[in-house]
Amino acid sequence: MAALQLSWKARSDLVSVGEYTRRNWGEAQAIRYLDKIQDCMDRLAENPMLGRACDEILPGRRRMEEGRHVIFYRIEKRRIMISRILHQSMLPQGRVQ
C-alpha cells in the first residue's frame, strides 16, 4: 500500500467541501461525504491505477471521481500525491499541479 500525501491545496479543498456540505446539508451529511472521499483515497493507496489518466490536463496526473468531486493525483515511488479535490463543475486546467 502506498502512502497518501495531500498537498496544501488538497487539504484546503477538503475543508471547503466539509464546510459547504455542513452549511447546506448538515453535520451528519458532511461527515458521511468526507468519509466517502477518504475511502476513495484509501482505495487509491491500495491500487493507484484505479483512476483514469488525465495527461491532457497535466502529464502524469490521474483522476478518480467520488460523488460530485474529482480527486486529482500522481503516482510517485512510495506515495500517492493528492494535488486537488475539485467539484465536477470546476475546470481543472490551471488548478491541478
Where are the regions a protein language model picked out?
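Non-catalytic interaction surface on structured domains
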Residues: 1-4, 24, 72-74, 79
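Short, well-structured N-terminal submotif of metal-dependent ribonuclease cores
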Residues: 1-6, 90-92
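Basic, Lys/Arg-enriched alpha-helical interface segments
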Residues: 3-61
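A generic local structural motif
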Residues: 58, 68-69
